[in-house]
């Protein structure tokens, strides 16, 4: 391993150790805890499993039982933070896999700069060290893409299927991955390739789902999957649907005929279905990664529930998108500023609500939701335009070569 890679990974590890250690200090000395409230849910659910019971006895546990199994060492070692160590390890290994995936696309120095978007990102580090499990999901997705790039379709499908079992949303990648395999094969064994990844993905989904269902029955399906289709969380929610969810949770409906929040899936899934068209002009693996990035960005922006941990879903794909971007440094700085601003406006009002007890849901917090949505829609447009300009340039170069 090159010494530059070792240096980056060492710094990344030390940063995580620092954040992790500070988190333990804050938890023991301050009223406001560093550890994510969800981590205590995971921990308690693992406690039920450790006693031979269902993790769903823990109120608000809405995840696959596999996650609670991962935290069983908390009880074996009698240390509540052991699960966080696992999440940090998945976080770091994901960074290593990002470096491996970037190999061949650019020089080593650029690879490490791009990988730093994940490895040195304070948002990523904070989320994993607070005890959020998104790093496990990101690891599964990146592994699926790593083996897809190397044409190891059976292994890729297994990782991809397991990621869908872990959380539903990666299923949106099925369409662009299918289009990529279909078009990049140039009619050579394309049906067989689609079949291989399709059957292995199905195994990756159904095998763990079957075993979890055998263990916990219908409550597993209800809490792990069905709940997320109807959830109405309105706390810590950046989404433009936040106010609608709040009103509906209080029994106030803006429409007599339908709950408006149920319409949230329409623009979201429409965009996720339309964006893979960007693959038609350029069927390279690099362009597939670009499409997955903008597709995920659109999914998060238009989702009816959007919290900071959801940003991880597209941040893990961002190094591949920025590898060959045509966005200038000046415009890039503006985009980063706007992205931070969109969160800062909302967080300023959320602070007044959470810590000052002020009733700022409307219009203050709603205004923050609108600002967040509009800025992120603008950024999505910038990213899509960037991809289209790259494919147009490649198309023109191809015509010149002919």
Curated annotation (Swiss-Prot):
Keyword Signal: no
Membrane topology: Multi-pass membrane protein
Keywords: Cell wall biogenesis/degradation, Endoplasmic reticulum, Glycosyltransferase, GPI-anchor biosynthesis, Membrane, Transferase, Transmembrane, Transmembrane helix
GO molecular function terms listed in the Swiss-Prot or TrEMBL record: alpha-1,4-mannosyltransferase activity; glycolipid mannosyltransferase activity
The enzyme's E.C. designation: 2.4.1.-
GO BP, sorted A to Z: cell wall organization; GPI anchor biosynthetic process
Pfam family, one: Mannosyl_trans
Pathway: Glycolipid biosynthesis; glycosylphosphatidylinositol-anchor biosynthesis
Function: Mannosyltransferase involved in glycosylphosphatidylinositol-anchor biosynthesis. Transfers the first alpha-1,4-mannose to GlcN-acyl-PI during GPI precursor assembly. Required for cell wall integrity.
UniProt protein name: GPI mannosyltransferase 1
Gene: GPI14
């Amino acid at each position: 391993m090159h010494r530059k890679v070792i240096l980056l990974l060492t710094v990344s590890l030390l940063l995580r150790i620092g954040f992790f250690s500070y988190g333990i200090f804050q938890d023991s000395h301050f009223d406001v805890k560093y550890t994510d409230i969800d981590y205590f849910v995971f921990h308690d659910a693992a406690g039920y499993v450790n006693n031979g019971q269902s993790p769903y006895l823990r109120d608000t546990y809405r995840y696959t039982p596999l996650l609670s199994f991962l935290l069983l060492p908390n009880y074996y070692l009698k240390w509540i933070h052991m699960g966080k160590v696992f999440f940090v390890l998945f976080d770091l290994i994901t960074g290593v896999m990002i470096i491996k995936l970037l190999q061949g696309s650019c020089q080593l120095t650029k690879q490490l700069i791009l990988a730093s978007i994940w490895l040195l990102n304070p948002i990523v580090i904070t989320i994993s060290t607070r005890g959020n499990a998104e790093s496990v999901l990101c690891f599964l997705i990146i592994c699926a893409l790593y083996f897809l790039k190397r044409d190891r379709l059976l292994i890729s499908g297994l990782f991809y299927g397991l990621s869908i079992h872990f959380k539903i949303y990666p299923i949106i990648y099925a369409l662009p991955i299918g289009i990529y395999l279909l078009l990049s094969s140039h009619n050579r064994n394309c049906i067989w390739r689609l079949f291989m990844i399709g059957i292995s993905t199905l195994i990756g989904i159904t095998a763990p789902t079957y075993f979890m269902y055998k263990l916990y029955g219908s409550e597993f399906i209800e809490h792990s999957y069905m709940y997320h289709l109807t959830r109405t969380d309105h706390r810590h929610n950046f989404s433009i649907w936040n106010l609608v969810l709040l009103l509906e949770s209080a029994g106030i409906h803006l429409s007599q005929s339908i709950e408006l929040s149920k319409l949230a899936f329409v623009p979201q899934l429409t965009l996720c279905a339309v964006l893979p068209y960007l693959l038609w002009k350029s069927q390279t693996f690099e362009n597939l990664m670009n499409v997955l990035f903008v597709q995920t960005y659109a999914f998060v922006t238009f989702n009816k529930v959007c919290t900071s941990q959801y940003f991880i879903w597209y941040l893990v794909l961002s190094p591949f998108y920025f590898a060959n971007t045509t966005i200038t440094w000046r415009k890039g700085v503006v985009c980063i500023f706007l992205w931070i601003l969109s969160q800062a406006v909302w967080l300023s009002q959320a602070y007044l609500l959470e810590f000052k007890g002020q009733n700022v849901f409307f219009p203050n917090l709603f205004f923050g939701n609108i600002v967040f949505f509009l800025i992120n829609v603008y950024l999505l447009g910038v990213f899509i335009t960037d991809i289209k300009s790259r494919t147009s340039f490649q198309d023109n170069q191809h015509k010149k070569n002919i």
